[in-house]
């Protein structure tokens, strides 16, 4: 594997952790997905390679395949400090057709199948809109553990829709492309889709643990597996709180390694989500990116991450979001394999063209993942990761080869 010399121009310290740079330059492997992590023995960070994405899926069928795309009907083989956000987005319309279909849901965590969930459906639709992006909508900010939001933002709140949120549901599909060098082990990412509980989630294990003999994919898959269990428990008695789900899952996860996490739930008061690290999600409405979760990093390529115990970041360090959604919205959740290689405009463009062509969520997720992979191996095109590296004082150009997970949800009226 070829390496690219990444020269460090301005070494800095952030958040009390010295960034790891040998002298004034270091060898940075463009295809390794190298990322910093907390070490087992202390809070000192070491630069280690990160990779891919492995799905933990609420409606899944176990398969030996590594590259997977799913519609909730079959399945096989990163950003700022914590806070609470309330997002109000304009009304949008997208006509979705409906196709009934019932089958049992199973969670697939790489090679392990978890307890059945409930029912599933697949809805499909079309949309024809132009592509553009807009600034973040009105929002409120507060600590993640404070579920009541503070007033904030400078834009006026858009009018609310007359459509009852209780009549909305998520129709989700996913696609996963592992790092070519990690296909044998399935990579380090995990994700889930819980159709009945209206929840999705992604996690990106920090692959640098492989240097000390640890498969971080075990941590991310266990974290997502326990997240599904926590979602099922909450679904039986009360509304689902993504932060509580992540806290419970983190407390139960004992595997070695570390991981980012993003959990999204559709509830009666809108879309509720928590994001910790450099995975994230985007909300697209009428050809517009109305929201993208900000990156949580202690420094460049130094993502927030959960680890067994409390030696790294904790769930409450994540950002909590409450977002108004409308029928016709498209939600894209992904690991940094997506967001390091695709700009907002590119993701939105794929969503618009895919829905216009009548693709279901699985098809849209596949298109996003495929474009991200194309960008990842293109050394002549500027990428979000390259932009961030350059802003941090490194000489870097091209994409970043990594595991890629894309989970796409259509918001539709039931």
Swiss-Prot record:
Note accompanying the cofactor annotation: Binds 2 magnesium or manganese ions per subunit.
EC number(s) reported in the record: 3.1.3.16
Binding site for Mn(2+) 1: 204-205
Cited Gene3D superfamilies: PPM-type phosphatase domain
Keyword terms: Hydrolase, Magnesium, Manganese, Metal-binding, Protein phosphatase
Reaction equation(s) it catalyzes: O-phospho-L-seryl-[protein] + H2O = L-seryl-[protein] + phosphate; O-phospho-L-threonyl-[protein] + H2O = L-threonyl-[protein] + phosphate
Annotated PPM-type phosphatase domain residues: 174-411
GO cellular component: chloroplast; chloroplast stroma
InterPro entries given in the database record: PPM-type-like_dom_sf, PPM-type_phosphatase-like_dom, PPTC7
Binding locations of Mn(2+) 2: 204, 336, 402
One Pfam family in the UniProt entry: PP2C_2
MF annotations from Gene Ontology: metal ion binding; protein serine/threonine phosphatase activity
CC cofactor: Mg(2+); Mn(2+)
PANTHER family for this protein: PROTEIN PHOSPHATASE 2C, PROTEIN PHOSPHATASE 2C 80-RELATED
Protein family per UniProt: Belongs to the PP2C family.
Name of the molecule in the record: Probable protein phosphatase 2C 80
Organism: Arabidopsis thaliana
Organism lineage: Eukaryota, Viridiplantae, Streptophyta, Embryophyta, Tracheophyta
């Amino acid at each position: 594997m070829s390496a690219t010399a990444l020269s460090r121009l301005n070494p800095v310290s952030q958040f009390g952790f010295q960034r790891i740079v040998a002298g004034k330059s270091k060898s940075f492997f463009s295809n390794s997905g190298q990322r910093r992590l907390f070490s087992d023995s202390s809070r000192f960070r070491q630069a280690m390679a990160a990779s891919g994405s492995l799905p933990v899926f609420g409606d899944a069928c176990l398969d030996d395949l590594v590259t997977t795309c799913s519609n909730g009907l079959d399945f096989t083989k990163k950003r700022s400090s914590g806070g609470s956000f309330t997002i109000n987005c304009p009304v949008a319309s997208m006509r979705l057709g409906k196709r009934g279909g019932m089958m049992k849901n199973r969670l697939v965590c790489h090679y392990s199948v978890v307890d059945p969930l409930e029912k599933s459906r697949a809805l499909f639709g079309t949309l024809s809109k132009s592509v553009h992006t807009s600034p973040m909508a009105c929002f409120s900010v507060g600590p993640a553990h404070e579920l009541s939001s503070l007033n904030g933002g400078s834009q006026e709140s858009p009018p609310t829709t007359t459509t009852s949120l209780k009549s909305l549901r998520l129709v989700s599909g996913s696609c996963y492309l592992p790092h070519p060098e990690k296909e044998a082990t399935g990579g380090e990412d995990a994700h889930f889709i819980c159709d009945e509980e209206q929840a999705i989630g992604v996690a990106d294990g920090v692959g640098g643990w492989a240097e000390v003999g640890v498969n971080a994919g075990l941590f991310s898959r266990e974290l997502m597996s326990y997240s599904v269990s926590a979602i099922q428990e909450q679904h039986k008695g009360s509304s689902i709180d993504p932060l509580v789900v992540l806290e419970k899952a983190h407390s139960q996860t004992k595997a070695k390694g570390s991981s980012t996490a993003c959990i999204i739930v559709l509830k009666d008061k809108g879309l509720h989500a928590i994001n910790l690290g450099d995975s994230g999600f985007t909300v697209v409405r009428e050809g517009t990116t109305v929201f993208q979760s900000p990156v949580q990093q202690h420094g460049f390529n130094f993502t927030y991450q959960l680890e067994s115990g409390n030696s790294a970041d904790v769930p409450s360090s994540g950002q909590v979001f409450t977002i108004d959604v409308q029928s016709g919205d498209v939600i894209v959740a992904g690991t940094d394999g997506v967001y390091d290689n695709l700009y907002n405009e590119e993701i939105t463009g794929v969503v618009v063209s895919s829905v216009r062509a009548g693709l279901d969520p699985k098809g849209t997720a596949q298109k996003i993942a495929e474009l991200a992979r194309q960008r990842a191996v293109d050394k002549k095109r500027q990428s979000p990761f390259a932009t961030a590296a350059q802003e941090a004082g490194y000489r870097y150009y091209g994409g970043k080869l990594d595991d890629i997970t894309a989970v796409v949800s259509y918001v539709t009226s039931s």
